[in-house]
């Protein structure tokens, strides 16, 4: 494939206009492999949304929180207004918050409370899934126009997305176990004298089921929820992106936007083997006439130094351009794959490699 496809500005426009035009969206998840710029992308999307929506919350579910670093401001479990904004809030979830929103089964002073935790723990992963579902129910009740989720790397995110399905299966087993234990519960009631009301158990399980259904329905509603995949044009990142997209499809979660970060755009240089020479072809203009010695012997020495410096700089320039084009050619292969895989069914935004490190978030995606 010709590199001309990627040289056209119109094909590499860093735009997610179609995402920002979806006014009904409530949850926007941003995810991908570690180190591809998820937090920068999340913050940029949230910043852009703050220009159009009444209120925006960006929420980090990644244990290695970076929102505070991105905005150069400390955030916590509580939504905090981001400096410089009137309607953009940020929060970073940690273990204490997740524990606080979980069902407090052990705090109930009833014999019933001694059984359900054991039933739940008998199903691998369901306790964590319950905590997540309750957390999402809490987030759902927040009165923000839209919430942007800055998620953990792909593996953690895939586990997170599988929780609703895991809960459905787990709760079905719990209902089955409850039915099988009905006789034992009646026996315990008669021996202990403490009434374990079956209605209480039913109510608790129905509450869990209702939360699971609510979260799953919101996840699978493309008018309310979407997922933005972030990657870079390298093998592992493109591979994980495809794995993530396939898993999202299995979970019936909308995903129609991909952000490709760190793209090395072409620079205006002559073609051929004289790229290094072209950089320095006018280097003689840098010399001031008054610096040139008039003495013949000194002039020879001066000229030798100039030639030596020129050759060193030329070699260094060739090395830099060699590294640039090697990296560029490697990216071209994966940019081609991204185009072939996603250009027809996805909105793909290509973000150029920045000259400087991102320390304060600005809108990178329009």
UniProtKB/Swiss-Prot annotation:
Positions that bind ATP: 33-40, 234, 261
Name the record gives this protein: ATPase ASNA1 homolog
CDD domains, per the entry: ArsA (cd02035)
EC number(s) per entry: 3.6.-.-
Active-site residues (renumbered): 62
UniProt entry tagged with the keyword Transcription regulation: no
Any Pfam family: ArsA_ATPase
Subunit annotation: Homodimer.
